[in-house]
Amino acid sequence: MMPSRTNLATGLPSSKVKYSRLASTDDGYIDLQFKKSPPKIPYKAIALATVLFLIGTFLIIIGSLLLSGYISKGGADRAVPVLIIGILVFLPGFYHLRIAYYASKGYRGYSYDDIPDFDD
């Protein structure tokens, strides 16, 4: 049988709980240095992506209406270049708007850093 510990100040036996002194928590760091700053939102790049998206959508609609003959009877010689330009303008706008949307919703793997900025 193990002898029980006694409290030296009072002479009473102590419980079996062992207490230890806490280490000093002052290690020179403050919590603010570990907090993330809010992300810098590239408003100009998002505005440009929106303009590209809208112009591309408009050109795709016009090109498809030209191709179907609804607007004029010019045929494919006018419609195909309009469709190609519309697709080339639409794709980067859609891509960057999608990144901006997912970054604003906080999806993992998407951030505003993925959108090119104008460095102003």
From Swiss-Prot:
Positions of transmembrane segments: 46-66, 79-99
Q: Which key words tag this protein in UniProt?
A: Cytoplasmic vesicle, Endosome, Golgi apparatus, Membrane, Phosphoprotein, Synapse, Transmembrane, Transmembrane helix
Principal location class: membrane
- One example of a Gene Ontology biological process annotation: axonal transport
Q: Per the record's keyword annotation, is Membrane included, yes or no?
A: yes
Q: In which tissues is it expressed?
A: Widely expressed, including dopaminergic neurons in the substantia nigra.
Question: Please, which domain of life does this record's source organism belong to?
Answer: Eukaryota
Q: Cellular location of this protein?
A: Membrane; Cytoplasmic vesicle, Secretory vesicle, Synaptic vesicle; Golgi apparatus, trans-Golgi network; Early endosome
Residues of the signal sequence?
A: none
For this record, an example GO cellular component is:
autophagosome
Phosphoserine occurs at S15, S24
Question: Mind telling me which InterPro entries this protein's record contains?
Answer: TMEM230, TMEM_230/134
Topology with respect to the bilayer: Multi-pass membrane protein
Which family does the record assign? Belongs to the TMEM134/TMEM230 family.
Functional summary from the UniProt entry: Involved in trafficking and recycling of synaptic vesicles.
Q: Which PANTHER family match?
A: C20ORF30 PROTEIN, TRANSMEMBRANE PROTEIN 230
This protein is called what?
Transmembrane protein 230
Q: What is the organism field in this record?
A: Mus musculus
Q: What is the lineage of its organism?
A: Eukaryota, Metazoa, Chordata, Craniata, Vertebrata
Gene name of this polypeptide: Tmem230
